[in-house]
């Protein structure tokens, strides 16, 4: 088993041929992928944290050595392998609730239309004829992006609370600025009114005094005319 750890997408490559494993590994690395290679379908299931029940070959159980913390974005497997074929591996992955969303691509050196149709109907994303070319691997990026986007969508968005509370903060700041402006206007208006009130007050007093002087007085009693 070989692992490269610095790539964006993580691909699990399955092939019983050492030459074909090395070939697909190099092509995937040129496509900036992290690659894990295994030589059988059973080892692929073991890496995912699954194993076939000895009592029931059709049933899957959790392996004691679980690798579920390692994110796999795509599985590419040879079709013709001893023991578990690529088609069998495809079915096992699609039967697993935890891993059925992982895209699976089948490779084969034999162009058999019925085999290709069966794999695609079972859920394979692509069926490549060997030798696989670098141009073929460009078709894998959209499939790998699906798993990345799904993982990101499942993450909780902590910033949501900040976004919700932000308008309330701005509204409070706006209200406080209005409150600060209002006293300023009131202060200016009061300063402008004060001399006017003083002037009006003087005029009123002068009018009272002049009125008092014009009224006749009898024994210090003012009579209204």
Swiss-Prot record:
Subcellular locations according to the entry: Nucleus
User: Where is it mainly found?
Assistant: nucleus
Q: Which domain of life is it from?
A: Eukaryota
Q: Gene Ontology terms, cellular component aspect?
A: nucleus
Q: Is Aminoacyl-tRNA synthetase included in the keywords of this UniProt record?
A: no
Q: Which residues carry this modification: 4-aspartylphosphate?
A: 78
Single Gene Ontology BP annotation:
regulation of DNA-templated transcription
The record's account of how the chain is modified after translation: Two-component system major event consists of a His-to-Asp phosphorelay between a sensor histidine kinase (HK) and a response regulator (RR). In plants, the His-to-Asp phosphorelay involves an additional intermediate named Histidine-containing phosphotransfer protein (HPt). This multistep phosphorelay consists of a His-Asp-His-Asp sequential transfer of a phosphate group between first a His and an Asp of the HK protein, followed by the transfer to a conserved His of the HPt protein and finally the transfer to an Asp in the receiver domain of the RR protein.
Segments forming domain Response regulatory: 10-145
Gene3D superfamilies, per the entry: 3.40.50.2300
- Which Pfam families does the record associate with it? Response_reg (PF00072)
Q: Name one GO molecular function term.
A: phosphorelay response regulator activity
Q: Could you tell me which SUPFAM superfamilies the record lists for this protein? A: CheY-like
Q: Which UniProt keywords apply?
A: Cytokinin signaling pathway, Nucleus, Phosphoprotein, Transcription, Transcription regulation, Two-component regulatory system
Q: In which tissues is it expressed?
A: Predominantly expressed in roots.
The family note in this entry says:
Belongs to the ARR family. Type-A subfamily.
Task: Give a short account of what the protein does.
Answer: Functions as a response regulator involved in His-to-Asp phosphorelay signal transduction system. Phosphorylation of the Asp residue in the receiver domain activates the ability of the protein to promote the transcription of target genes. Type-A response regulators seem to act as negative regulators of the cytokinin signaling.
PANTHER family xrefs: TWO-COMPONENT RESPONSE REGULATOR, TWO-COMPONENT RESPONSE REGULATOR ARR8
This one is known as Two-component response regulator ARR8
Organism equals Arabidopsis thaliana (Mouse-ear cress)
């Amino acid at each position: 088993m070989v692992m490269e750890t610095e790539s964006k997408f993580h691909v699990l490559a399955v092939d019983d041929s050492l030459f074909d494993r090395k070939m697909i590994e190099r092509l995937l690395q040129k496509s900036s992928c992290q690659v894990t290679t295994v030589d059988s379908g059973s080892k692929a299931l073991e890496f995912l944290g699954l194993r076939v029940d000895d009592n029931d070959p059709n049933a899957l159980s959790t392996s004691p050595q679980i690798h579920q913390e390692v994110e796999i974005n795509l599985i590419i497997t040879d079709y013709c392998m001893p023991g578990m074929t690529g088609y069998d591996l495809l079915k096992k992955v699609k039967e697993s609730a935890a891993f059925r969303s992982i895209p699976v691509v089948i490779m084969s050196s034999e162009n058999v239309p019925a085999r290709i149709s069966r794999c695609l109907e079972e859920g394979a994303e692509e069926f490549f004829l060997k030798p696989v070319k670098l141009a073929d691997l460009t078709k894998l990026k959209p499939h790998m992006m699906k798993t990345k986007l799904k993982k990101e969508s499942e993450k909780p968005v902590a910033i949501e609370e900040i976004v919700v509370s932000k308008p309330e903060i701005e509204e409070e700041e706006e209200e406080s600025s209005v409150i600060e402006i209002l006293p300023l206007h009131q202060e200016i208006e009061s300063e402008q009114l004060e001399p006017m009130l003083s002037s009006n007050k003087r005029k009123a007093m002068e009018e009272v005094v002049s009125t008092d002087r014009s009224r006749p007085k009898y024994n210090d009693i003012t009579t209204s005319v």
